[in-house]
Amino acid sequence: ILPMGQVIAIKCNGLAIGKYANMAQLGVPFFNNAKEGLDNAGKKGWEIGRIPLPVFMEHIQLIGTPDISKIDTVPMTIDEFPAIDADFMTIAKWAGRLVRIDNVYFTRQEYDYGKPADLDEADKIFAPSTNGIGYPQSRIFALQSDPKKISAIGTSEYAKFADAPLPASDYVGSITGFISYYWDKGGSS
């Protein structure tokens, strides 16, 4: 939507702030009727929803011109990820931070109830469709020097690259993204 390196200011009037997995989330008020997809009666009520693109564009102001050199990532290793059972302050320190992990590759697996599982051929993309349910898709990556050290990225099916194929496991590179936490009943994070 906007070029990388574009600084923006967001006018929050008319938007709502909530949380997802203890991270602040900016969106629009949305009433979950607990009748669609995998929703359950316990989730019925108001929550934060996605910001439609036209609404997003009305709420931003561009500051200066895009400058990719000003994107500041924190280099990190898999071992440095705070454990999901860490105290709130540790999680709060890292959640939402833009980090880069070098020398990793995709294993072409996902977490299934907290354990690595091979992907079907059709699912070897970043985020297969959830038919509108919208839960993030986990894709496992490993450290080249120690393949037993793994973690995962979560990608929304709404991402521009959602249906792009995962790189072959012999492709080693860097992953840049925001740290977030997700905890399901199966124990994956």
Which role does the model predict for each range below?
Residues 1-189:
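OB-fold nucleic-acid-binding modules
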